[in-house]
Each structure stands twice: as C-alpha cells, then as structure tokens.
C-alpha cells in the first residue's frame, strides 16, 4: 500500500498532462512559462511534501494546491504581469486565466496564504477562506514559511 501511495504521489508531482506546451506547473505558486520561472507574488502555498491533517487522515496539502492550480489553468496559457525578481532570481508576477487572478483564486480556495511579509494584497481572500473553513482552513496545518524552517 505504501508503494502504491508513493507512486501516486510521484505521478501527481509531475502531472502536467493537458497543459499548454509552453507551460509547466512546478508547485502551487510557481510555474515555468516559455522557459521563464515565475513565482506568484503576494502568496505562499504549502510545499509539495507538506502534509495537513484532516480528521485522522494525512493529506498532501502541497500536492492538493498544485493540482488545484493544474485544474484551474486547464489547457489555457496564463497571462502574467511581472513585478520584479526575488532573491532566487525567479520572476515575481501575478498571473491570470480569463481575467481571474490565479493568486486570488488559490487564496480564496484555502490552498494559499496571503504572504503578509511581502504584500497585503490577498488578505480579504484569506479571511474569506478562513471564515468558511475552505481548503487547508478545514484541517490542521503548518504555515509554509514555518514548515520550511523545520
């Protein structure tokens, strides 16, 4: 059973089936578009190997965030407004599908957090998700920035 779970997790990590040829989704807040690595500004999603607890079940919340993004993008190509570079030389941008901010969508769905250290842009969306116990707000979780420290 553990081997099957491991295979499933690996498959989901690299799942980009159905996406435009010029697009790869790295994780919940990072894409590669036309060879350019783009980090969504103002939000933070759980790391791919990060888990949450829902009832007595362990949930791969980082993979859930990525899969939500894959599903939202579908076979469309995001349009991104670049805002500069981060310390890792990734382009920081807000990206849109059919006029909707992917960052706002992820935060409002409860699988991303307003990254208050850098921006106050998505606080309303986070409050909505928290009040309605959406996504990770319905589980026990560790903030991604705390998870990365451990």
Regions found by a protein language model. Name each.
Residues 2-150:
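Small beta-barrel nucleic-acid-binding modules, primarily SNase/OB-fold domains
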């Amino acid at each position: 059973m553990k081997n099957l779970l491991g295979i499933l997790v690996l498959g989901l990590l690299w799942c980009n089936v159905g996406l435009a040829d010029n697009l790869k989704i790295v994780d919940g807040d990072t894409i590669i578009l036309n060879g350019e690595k783009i980090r969504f500004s103002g939000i933070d999603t759980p790391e791919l190997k990060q888990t949450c607890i829902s009832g007595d079940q362990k949930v791969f919340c980082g993979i859930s965030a990525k899969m939500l993004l894959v599903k939202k993008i579908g076979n469309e190509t995001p349009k991104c407004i670049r805002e500069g570079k981060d310390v890792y030389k990734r382009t920081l941008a807000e990206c849109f599908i059919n006029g909707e901010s992917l960052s706002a969508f992820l935060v409002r769905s409860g699988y991303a957090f307003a990254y208050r250290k850098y921006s106050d842009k998505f606080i309303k969306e986070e409050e909505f998700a928290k009040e309605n116990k959406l996504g990770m707000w319905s589980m026990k979780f560790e903030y991604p920035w705390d998870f990365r420290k451990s």
